[in-house]
A protein has these predicted regions:
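Structured alpha-helical
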Residues: 1-133
């Protein structure tokens, strides 16, 4: 009988890590109609190895180039060029999925490390919450 190995190494499927961290960002892009530069502040929902999901009040069009600055205590920790690959137009939580186009090694080391640090600072266990069954 044949043995099937389901490990990721046998399939060569890359593992992509995402860290759920809410870090402040500033996104800027040029509006195609007016030619004006739009600057919007927002928060990350998650940070991945080559992408991020950000909550922005004004969403850029899919396919547009966005300059993204990830902030920490009012200073920029990394600034990269990104491209919008998907938007979610939920009025209560508008989201844009951005893929990083440059400096992937720096993104992985800087943004991922900052996201891990954010989680460490904000991770709290609350054992006093009531459980709903």
């Amino acid at each position: 009988m044949a043995q099937v190995d389901y490990s990721t190494s046998s399939y060569k499927t890359p593992l992509h890590h995402r860290i759920l961290a809410h870090m402040p960002v500033v996104a800027s892009w040029v509006d195609a109609e007016s030619g004006e530069t739009i600057n919007v502040e927002g928060m990350t929902e998650n940070v991945g190895e080559s992408s991020t999901l950000v909550n922005l009040e004004t969403l850029p069009p899919v396919g547009s180039a966005v300059r993204l600055r990830v902030m920490e205590e009012d200073k920029t920790i990394i600034e990269v060029s990104t491209q919008v690959i998907r938007v979610e137009r939920d009025p209560s939580k508008p989201l844009a999925a951005l893929t990083v186009l440059e400096n992937l090694k720096k993104w992985k080391s800087t943004a991922m490390t900052a996201a891990e640090a954010w989680v460490t600072r904000h991770w709290q266990l609350n054992y006093e919450e009531e459980w709903v069954n």
